[in-house]
Amino acid sequence: MGMGMRRERDAEAELNLPPGFRFHPTDDELVEHYLCRKAAGQRLPVPIIAEVDLYKFDPWDLPERALFGAREWYFFTPRDRKYPNGSRPNRAAGNGYWKATGADKPVAPRGRTLGIKKALVFYAGKAPRGVKTDWIMHEYRLADAGRAAAGAKKGSLRLDDWVLCRLYNKKNEWEKMQQGKEVKEEASDMVTSQSHSHTHSWGETRTPESEIVDNDPFPELDSFPAFQPAPPPATAMMVPKKESMDDATAAAAAAATIPRNNSSLFVDLSYDDIQGMYSGLDMLPPGDDFYSSLFASPRVKGTTPRAGAGMGMVPF
């Protein structure tokens, strides 16, 4: 919706204007029904004209301060003198100045001159080298009555309490500029709407990465059992020899140094081989009863023991 249309709808609501209301008064209507009543402090037909000091602003900043209008805007504004004792108005405004063009035109409803109409063009910059713009203003002032009252205040800069101004852009550049802004705003709103469409109702924004994480590309692999590493191989426990050990304990410790799972190593061992194993330990467990039970094993080859020597074998 354009700025002018929004302003008109606001005015329709605030001022209780009928739908489709248009404000296009003639010069006679402006002077007789609005300017004269404003100067006299009377009630206006419709309070639709804003009170703004036009000479404090550039013309392109004024449409936003108007109460109504899309292509032309109306204001009540005071006028000051250029010099304290002179009658020329001060035309400096904003970053430029207004310059009169053409001859003054009397406004005479029903044959009686009530006001004067003057046309002015806005120049940007300082006089006399300002740049002419397309902003036009029609200024309506009362014929002599207002000026006479103001002139009575000697030394005052106020020339007129109120004049009525109609402002417009000759090439309608302001409206085109507003339309360009509206196009940009609509494009921005469209982009924002599209970005919201990619957001779930719970506020989580979906991204390509989240889609990859959420969707398992190989669901059939879930049926395979989890990989379990094999346990490390058993190692032999070494028990150090201590002087305080008795013979039976030392023999058991020596047996523990031999892996139990590798008992096949003793299949071809003879008694002499076994005895040689213990001779390396500088000790032989005493007692023939301890070793005699070992010869019952079918794994050990029978040999003739030496006289006076004990027989022994590590149990497995």
UniProtKB/Swiss-Prot annotation:
User: Which residue numbers delimit the NAC domain?
Assistant: 17-170
Is Lipid biosynthesis found in the keyword set? no
Tissue and organ distribution: Expressed in roots and stamens.
Q: Which Gene3D superfamilies match?
A: NAC domain
Show the InterPro entries listed in the entry.
NAC-dom, NAC_dom_sf
Residue segments, region Disordered: 185-210
Q: Which Pfam families match?
A: NAM
Which residues fall in a compositionally biased region of kind Polar residues?
190-200
Q: Which residues bind DNA?
A: 114-176
Expression induction or repression: Induced by drought stress, salt stress and cold stress. Induced by abscisic acid (ABA). Induced by methyl jasmonate.
Q: Which GO CC terms are listed, alphabetically?
A: nucleus
Name a biological process GO annotation: positive regulation of response to water deprivation
Subcellular location per the Swiss-Prot or TrEMBL entry: Nucleus
Q: Does the keyword Cell membrane apply?
A: no
What's the domain remark here? Answer: The NAC domain includes a DNA binding domain and a dimerization domain.
- Comment field (misc): Plants overexpressing NAC002 exhibit improved tolerance to drought and salt stresses.
What functional role does this protein have?
Transcription factor that possesses transactivation activity. Transcription activator involved in response to abiotic stresses. Plays a positive role during dehydration and salt stress. Binds specifically to the 5'-CATGTG-3' motif found in promoters of stress-responsive genes.
Cite the record's note on assembly: Forms homodimer. Interacts with NAC071.
Q: What is this protein called?
A: NAC domain-containing protein 2
